[in-house]
Amino acid sequence: MKIAVMGMGVAGSYLMARLKNSEHEVVGYERMPTERHDSICAWGTIKEELTNFCKKTGRNFDDFLIHDGKEMHVKMNDNVKFDIGLKGLCTYNKLGLIKDFIKDCNVIYGKAPR
């Protein structure tokens, strides 16, 4: 089966990694050229979920982990301060993980599929 994956963000790159060694012909498409391919949204996630995704693709999420949050300190405009306890929230090298998911995959940059 021929499969086209649109967009090399976290979801698209993860799908590419999962299908990489399958019997399918898989091509990824990223609208941005290679040199402008970036991750433009939040870099926070639920650690347990990304740990599971990485395990399914033979990766260790700890290799991409930047900060494993325990507490968030909040300061409001009116100088009100408070702390929020965190459970599982972390920041990670999102672009590094995306690029690792798609390494050695067939990805076409800067073109829309026809």
Regions found by a protein language model. Give the residues of each.
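Residue-level detector of family-conserved "landmark" positions at structurally sensitive sites
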Residues: 29, 64, 108-110
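Helix N-cap / beta->alpha transition motif
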Residues: 7, 42-47, 85, 93
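Glycine-rich FAD pyrophosphate-binding loop
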Residues: 4-6, 14-40
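N-terminal FAD cofactor-binding segment of flavoenzymes
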Residues: 31-73
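Conserved N-terminal helical subregion
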Residues: 55-59, 68-114
